Amino acid sequence: MTQAATLSPTPFGRVVTAMVTPFDASGAVDLSVAANLARHLVEQGSDGLLVCGTTGESPTLSWDEQLQLLQAVRDAVGSDAKVLAGTGSNSTAEAVEATKEAAAAGADGALVVVPYYNKPPQEGLEAHFRAIAEAAPELPLMLYNIPGRTGCSIAPATVARLMDCPNVVSFKAASGTTEEVTALRLACGPQLAIYSGDDGLTLPMLAVGAVGVVSVGSHVAGPEIRAMIEAYLNGDGASALALHDALIPLFKALFATTNPIPVKAALELNGWSVGAPRPPLCSLSDDMKRSLSNAMAALRQT
């Protein structure tokens, strides 16, 4: 195991679930289901909960809906888990305001995505994140790099320059490569807590310095994901690898099409009335739902 996995801070624990946003039959946010789901996820091993991220369908939620959801989840779990709010935007002014509101609402941290669509250069990205950090200096920030959705990527050297902001404490690596984790660790040192942003890469990323995962799969496989991470940290590589191998078919099914379409279907299969995604996303096809159900059943048998 890498020293970074044990020496780096874990400001939000090891397993952070990127929560879905439940909708009722009318398409409105269902705060009651969200609260119940939040408590369930903590019982299943989540140290932290992220509301209104990619999985939470933030692009189709109003800021008022996002704030209500944050408050409902915060009230539901109390001090039993860290609660992060997705406050990113491709408008710096909007991201600053959302982050300040999240801090005032009692969030334990904010996930701030690289600005999407307008593709700022590195100096623009640095100024963007610095403005957010300075606007809410007491709120720990997790920078979020997901170039497949945003169209641009923040460089490790840019992140390193931002480390003089005391509240830039963590990074969600969702570029799909372990190389990003290595580059960040070398550029920023062990004080930056790097989280895998890809369920299937959690174990490989732990091996090169990540401290945990911001997970989608933990909605339905929280205990197994937690056990994999703990086995690795305890030096039991064989058990960690066996759990990784057992989880991969589920992860493939959960990302067979655009997230969060499959995970909402998985929750419905487990009896959670979270509703379909808001348009322009859609429900999971019957064929994919059968494959997903089979993958969930196979994991239960391991």
Swiss-Prot record:
Q: GO terms for CC?
A: cytosol
Among the record's GO biological process terms, what is one? lysine biosynthetic process via diaminopimelate
**Chain sites annotated for binding pyruvate:** T55, V214
Superkingdom to which the source organism belongs: Bacteria
- Class in the EC hierarchy, top level: lyase
What's its catalytic activity? Answer: L-aspartate 4-semialdehyde + pyruvate = (2S,4S)-4-hydroxy-2,3,4,5-tetrahydrodipicolinate + H2O + H(+)
| A molecular function GO annotation | 4-hydroxy-tetrahydrodipicolinate synthase activity
SMART domains attached to this UniProt entry: DHDPS
Main subcellular location of this protein, as a coarse class: cytoplasm
Q: Name one Pfam family in it.
A: DHDPS
Q: InterPro entries from the entry?
A: Aldolase_TIM, DapA, DapA-like, Schiff_base-form_aldolases_AS, Schiff_base-form_aldolases_CS
The positions flagged as active site in the entry are Y144, K172
Residues the record annotates as the site (Part of a proton relay during catalysis) are T54, Y117
| Matching PROSITE patterns | DHDPS_1, DHDPS_2
Q: What is its EC number?
A: 4.3.3.7
Where is this chain's protein located in or outside the cell? Cytoplasm
Q: In which pathway does it act?
A: Amino-acid biosynthesis; L-lysine biosynthesis via DAP pathway; (S)-tetrahydrodipicolinate from L-aspartate: step 3/4
UniProt keywords, alphabetically: Amino-acid biosynthesis, Cytoplasm, Diaminopimelate biosynthesis, Lyase, Lysine biosynthesis, Schiff base
| Family the entry assigns | Belongs to the DapA family.
- What exactly does this protein do? Catalyzes the condensation of (S)-aspartate-beta-semialdehyde [(S)-ASA] and pyruvate to 4-hydroxy-tetrahydrodipicolinate (HTPA).
Q: HAMAP family under this entry?
A: DapA
Question: Subunit details for this protein?
Answer: Homotetramer; dimer of dimers.
Annotated protein name in UniProt: 4-hydroxy-tetrahydrodipicolinate synthase
